[in-house]
UniProtKB/Swiss-Prot annotation:
Signal peptide positions on this chain: 1-30
This protein's name: Pancreatic lipase-related protein 2
Organism from which the protein derives: Mus musculus (Mouse)
Induction, as annotated: Up-regulated in CD8-positive T cells by IL4/interleukin-4.
Cross-referenced Gene3D superfamilies: alpha/beta hydrolase, PLAT/LH2 domain
UniProt-recorded Gene Ontology molecular function terms: calcium ion binding; galactolipase activity; monoacylglycerol lipase activity; phospholipase activity; triacylglycerol lipase activity
Enzyme Commission numbers on file: 3.1.1.26, 3.1.1.3
Domain of life: Eukaryota
Membrane topology of the entry: Peripheral membrane protein
Cysteines joined through disulfide linkages: 34-40, 122-133, 269-293, 317-328, 331-336, 466-482
Gene behind the chain: Pnliprp2
């Protein structure tokens, strides 16, 4: 299905054309279309006739979009039950439980509610909680040109809001127990639902909210912090759509905004031939895993966080560059939030809006990482060139070897680096040191670590290890608590 964003223009390109179009459209009187219990939808500003979305079109009707609510619960984890706000009897006859939290999962462009990742997310939730998990299917409204799909989000959001209202008025179910999780365009669907419910929804999670037709627009058009009591956002594809094909927003739109790996290029999503030659108007469903890898990482990170609550700690920092240069370590006294499912456990989650956090993840498969600062003081007879590596050994497991430094190795000098460990080793009991210079040396020099200090990111706790030994290259040296 082509992704045609010609109706969604960007301030950074074709500014003059956009301004002229916007000026022309401003002279045209706004109109609206009404869809029964969902109310009326205007095609005037700010919904249309703006620089970012000059096309004055309407969202499709509810009948054309055909939004469906697919309910999964702990009692029916494999087969959904369809519930309808216009027929409350379907809710009463289902496994929907009033004493549980309800989490809606909302797909984005060219996706569908029966896609595997939505059910996978539900099933992970069932492993840790009793929950009503509703997959929102609006594929008939999402599998069209992108511009039309972006306008259709308003009707889907209205449908969700109406269902939540029915649950509240007919069954006494509080909107505070509702969590809306939206990917891409689904993030803005969630925002529209939250806006219609006047921000009384308990939580909205935006998974790489879509940029085209939304970034830079007024709050009522896009996801923003006022749409729920708590809004958290994961940005994974925030590079500009022109020329980098970044589909996600770089704009901060939540109380907590997480930028894993800097928010632009995710590990395991390196550029390939297909993603470099594909045109913005020619992305079809069969190639989305190639061309939109970064964009899809957001829901994969969230799903992984459900069963790995401690492996996605976000560090407050003003930029990814400062984060990478060790300027934002360890977590402050009030702690760091957990990106993903457990972000709402952070005590300062709504202290202010647009709080910014950075972290690193793994590539495909094991995304979780635990951050440490490692300080190595060397010992030896003379200066050498090469690299040094350290492995952590704890009560929960052992890490692989991580490079701390490469270059000139000076005895008595100290080398410091932050590392992102792929295993939660727990309380560190010992460390192992190794050095190598990849050069044949007949004198077989030795070097060692006299002291290694490891500081844990989550709480700043330090572990100190010492040794008086030196070792030949490629020979492991064990250090124990001083």
């Amino acid at each position: 299905m082509p992704m045609d964003v010609r109706g969604c223009l960007f301030p950074s390109v074709q500014m003059l054309l956009c301004w002229l179009v916007s000026l022309l459209l401003a002279t045209v009187g706004g109109k609206e279309v009404c869809y029964g219990h969902l109310g009326c939808f205007s095609n005037d500003k700010p919904w249309a006739g703006m620089i970012q979305r000059p096309s004055k079109i309407f969202p499709w009707s509810p009948e054309d979009i055909d939004t469906r609510f697919l309910l999964y619960t702990n009692e029916n984890p494999n087969n959904y039950q369809i519930i309808s706000a216009t027929d409350p009897a379907t809710i009463n006859a289902s496994n929907f439980q009033l004493d549980r939290k309800t989490r809606f999962i909302i797909h984005g462009f060219i996706d569908k509610g029966e896609e595997g990742w939505l059910l996978d997310m539900c099933k992970k939730m069932f492993q840790v909680e009793k929950v009503n998990c509703i997959c929102v299917d609006w594929k008939r409204g999402s599998r069209t040109e992108y511009t039309q799909a972006s306008y259709n989000t308003r009707v889907v959001g209205a449908e969700i809001a109406f269902l939540v209202q029915v649950l509240s008025t007919e069954m006494g179910y509080s909107p505070e127990n509702v969590h809306l999780i939206g990917h891409s365009l689904g993030s803005h669907v969630a925002g529209e639902a939250g806006r219609r419910l006047e921000g009384h929804v308990g939580r909205i999670t935006g998974l790489d909210p879509a940029e085209p037709c939304f970034q830079g627009l007024p709050e009522e058009v896009r996801l923003d912090p006022s749409d729920a009591m708590f809004v958290d956002v994961i940005h994974t594809d925030s590079a500009p759509i022109i020329p980098y094909l970044g589909f996600g927003m770089s704009q901060k739109v939540g109380h907590l905004d997480f930028f894993p790996n800097g928010g632009k290029e995710m590990p395991g999503c390196q550029k390939n031939i297909l993603s470099t030659i594909v045109d913005i108007n020619g992305i079809w469903e069969g190639t989305r895993n190639f061309a939109a890898c970064n964009h899809l990482r957001s829901y994969k990170y969230y799903a992984s966080s459900i069963l790995n609550p401690d492996g996605f700690l976000g560090y407050p920092c003003s930029s990814y560059e400062k984060f990478q240069h060790n300027d934002c370590f360890p977590c402050p006294e009030q702690g760091c939030p957990k990106m993903g499912h457990y972000a709402d456990q952070f005590e300062g989650k709504t202290a202010t809006v647009e709080q910014t956090f950075f972290l690193n993840t793994g590539d495909s498969g094991n995304f979780t990482r635990w951050r440490y600062k490692v300080s190595v003081t060397l010992s030896g007879a003379k200066k050498l060139s090469g690299y040094i590596l350290v492995a952590l050994y704890g009560c929960n497991g052992n890490s692989k070897q991580y490079e701390v430094f490469k270059g000139s190795l000076q005895p008595e000098a100290r080398y410091i680096r932050d590392i992102d460990v792929d295993v939660n080793v727990g309380e560190i009991q010992k460390v192992k040191f190794l050095w190598n210079n990849k050069v044949i040396n007949l004198f077989r020099p030795t070097m060692g670590a006299s002291q290694i200090t490891v500081q844990r990111g989550k709480d700043g706790k330090e572990f100190n290890f010492c040794s008086s030994n030196t070792v030949h290259e490629d020979v492991l040296q064990s250090l124990y608590p001083c």
